[in-house]
Amino acid sequence: MKNGKISESVLKRSVLKQLHTTSDRILFKPAVGEDCAVISMQAGGQTKLVTATQMFMLDVSDKHVRANCAVYDALNNIYAMGAGPVGIELALLVPTTENEAVLRETVRAIDAVCEEAGIVVLGGHTQVSRAVKNIVVTVTAIGEAYEQALTPSSAAAPGMDVIVTGYVGLEGTAILANEKRAELETRFSKAFIDKSAAYIDHISPAMEAASAIGAGVAAIHDASQGGIFGALWDMAEASGIGLDIDLKKLPIRQDTIEISEFFDINPYKLLSGGSLIIIAADGTRVVRELEK
């Protein structure tokens, strides 16, 4: 199989099709574009348990970068579903080449991100294995939401407006600036690289999600994985509609464009943590609320 995220056809054929998902307590069964499980805790209860799992396994040396990406790539799915996070379950798979100090620093960095987000590490599992070359961080974010506040990707409908918050490719730009600094220094100034590297502290869309939901939206999708192109495709697939997008209107920073050109990367395929795709019947109202 090809390295990286599996294709939609493989996901449908060899993963989703194999799952038994019939349960009266499950509001949304596993599907393309739906990144959260939503569970009814009791019959007739309005509060729902919301969970989302993400795995971060990029070869990233900076503990702060790894922690931010691992935690927020999961949390952002919770925010996008209209839920408030409570905590995370953390699983670490550590290569035999690492020492205990690296493990300690990794956990400390993850806990610091959780504290910043107002959540805690609820539990998890840690294991050392020869099967991996880099630390693999798996985060399951757990949150809660009222049923009427849920904003699944599948709720988008024809004729609605599409709003994109944050900046396309911001997370990927930050990772490249932190991890490829020596290469970037052959063209860009230290100030330019430092500014791009600092974007790693701006990949949470919690405030934007809350503002949008308050204004009344139908669907929200986190753009972290697969870049904005992948996220738009997932949302269209989940809702069974087409999306008419003006590429020139997608919010993207100039340094993202320049760094992408330097590495010959499509900026619209970069990790886009901090960016949300919002579908609403009244997009103007949502934008006004976001601009407050």
Language model segments and positions:
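Helix-biased detector of long, well-ordered alpha-helical tracts
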Residues: 1-292
